[in-house]
């Protein structure tokens, strides 16, 4: 049928030339291409969104997790100033200030911290699970605290952790394990205390030359405390070093220590995964909803590209750095007379 149609078409045409294409018009609209500037076209349509509403909104009806003056570390460890975050509902994304003041109240560091933040970009809810109850450590003192983490003027400590110290001038080997039967991966955090001198070491743990050993089917980590003189931070010359791991389903994590162990009381079951992220912002949640959020504000558009901010969460156009992006159609506007 197609062959017959073409034959009929050609037999119906009179003249010595057939032109198939757009009809040139008198448009003066020009665009810049990768190879050439000021190319004249018949039509150009803007396909780049440049605006936002300046607000932090719920994403598809789900509010973000507002950390306020707390950092990621302060939230997960349980800084006493972050008590409102001890139990949090599902979040769409996380709002963290550039320099939150409530992080590690007891000075130190958090190993692989950026990797932990990257993990949070695919998590939308944690369920706290008590894995090593405080009262299981019957041969050790579990009320260790510091004025650096004070509550109402009294020494305190990270709510989700247990600082094990000597009991009745004795520190026997501390052993504890947890088998993950939760049905999901679990985030486990622990710490090692690094005293300022040997006197502090003996006062807290009786023993010297101590170790902290942590093991799973994929992890074998043994740490020894580093006793050293350091500048004081929050009034302390000693430090705490925190580490984390993901415990797979049905795997077991085991702790063994002769001193300096900061044991986890709680683990964090990853109860819901999904696209999330951490928005670095000084803003607060407003009464609005969106499908696409950036740290600068929400985007509401049907255009395929935007240049608002490289970090987006939700159903968003593709980010480009360009200041202008258009879709050009039609032939170059150069009218020509054909005989």
UniProtKB/Swiss-Prot annotation:
GO terms for cellular component: host cell plasma membrane; membrane; viral envelope; virion membrane. Binds to sialic acid-containing receptors on the cell surface, bringing about the attachment of the virus particle to the cell. This attachment induces virion internalization of about two third of the virus particles through clathrin-dependent endocytosis and about one third through a clathrin- and caveolin-independent pathway. Plays a major role in the determination of host range restriction and virulence. Class I viral fusion protein. One of its GO terms (biological process) is virion attachment to host cell. It comes from the Viruses. In natural infection, inactive HA is matured into HA1 and HA2 outside the cell by one or more trypsin-like, arginine-specific endoprotease secreted by the bronchial epithelial cells. One identified protease that may be involved in this process is secreted in lungs by club cells. Glycans are attached at residues 25-26, 38, 179-180, 300. Keywords: Clathrin- and caveolin-independent endocytosis of virus by host, Clathrin-mediated endocytosis of virus by host, Disulfide bond, Fusion of virus membrane with host endosomal membrane, Fusion of virus membrane with host membrane, Glycoprotein, Hemagglutinin, Host cell membrane, Host membrane, Host-virus interaction, Lipoprotein, Membrane, Palmitate, Signal, Viral attachment to host cell, Viral envelope protein, Viral penetration into host cytoplasm, Virion, Virus endocytosis by host, Virus entry into host cell. Residues 1-15 form the signal peptide. Disulfide bonds join 57-288, 70-82, 105-149, 292-316. The keyword Lipoprotein applies. Gene3D superfamilies: 3.90.209.20, Hemagglutinin Chain A, Domain 2. Pfam families: Hemagglutinin (PF00509). Major glycoprotein, comprises over 80% of the envelope proteins present in virus particle. Homotrimer of disulfide-linked HA1-HA2. Belongs to the influenza viruses hemagglutinin family. This is Hemagglutinin. GO terms for molecular function: host cell surface receptor binding. It is a single-pass type I membrane protein. The gene is HA. The keyword Glycoprotein applies. It is found in: Virion membrane; Host apical cell membrane. Residues 16-339 are extracellular.
